[in-house]
Structures are given as C-alpha cells and as structure tokens.
Amino acid sequence: AAFGAGDVTVELTETDGSLAVSVQAQNTPVRELVLTWKAVFNGSGEVLGDTWERGYGDLEWKKEADHIGMPWYFFRHEAGKCLAFGVKVRPSAMCWWEKDGADVKLHLDVRCGTYGVELGGRKLEAAKIVMTSYALEEADTPVEVFEACRAFCSEMCDDPDCRDTVIYGGNNW
C-alpha cells in the first residue's frame, strides 16, 4: 500500500513477517512519519516499554497511560495474552510507540538533527515493524509473560552479534 501528500510517498510492504515502512520525497524535507492503528485496545492492561538511554530501575510493568513515549518496542499484558509491538533492530529512524486511548501510534523520526531529511527522490526504508500476540495459559504466570517478551525480542533481531568471548565496556559519559 502507498499513501502520498504532495511529493512525499509512504509505502508499506509486507516482507519476512514484518511491515517495511519506506518514504520517498523529491523536494520536501521529511521530519517524521506517524502511523496509527485504530481501536487496538479494549479494556485495561499493563505495559512494559524500553527507555531511550538505559534503565535506572524504572523498567517495570505499569498501568497504561496515554501519550507516554516507549522507544523501539513495548508489551501490553492483559488477561490471557501478551501483545507485542516493535521495530526490527537497526532502523533508519528514531522510533517510539505511544498509546492514545484505544489507539496505538508509531512515530518514525527521520530528521537530520533538527532538519527534515532531504531525500532528493531517494527511497528511505525507515523501519520494519513487527507485531504479535502471545496466548497465555490459564495460569497467566510471570514466567509465561517473560518468555513471550523474550521470544518477541528475538523476533526483532534477525542477526544477533553473539561473540565467543566476553565483551567489557561501560556507558559512563
């Protein structure tokens, strides 16, 4: 499917179990794409999302709230199932999810600094979206939910860089 406004075209293509989002523009600088899925949620649930930098003890299941940015991926746990929403690793956009009432929005920020990217007619694959739902057994245990989240994180990465040796490092600016 393709959508357009002016000289900007957004293309959605199903491929390898994901939905590729591409944008093409001749002259218009593109800043952000926002995709919305209508009426995804009904009822209440809890969400677990990532953080932009690193976790400071704040990664936890929380009562869902509207308009909270959840970078890269998030999970929603409700009775009997775990819903998973994410983008595959190494996208060409800064991606974050947002709950807006019953809707889900995905923001794809393709700016260059604070300016829109000037594509000059080129096509940019902004991200590959993956979504799934995991049915949980009647017990609906934390272990089941953890395993669903773990499986989805594996789905987001087609080519993990697993090393034979230990890698040491720090992120202390």
Regions found by a protein language model. Give the residues of each.
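Carbohydrate-recognition beta-sandwich/jelly-roll modules
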Residues: A1-W173
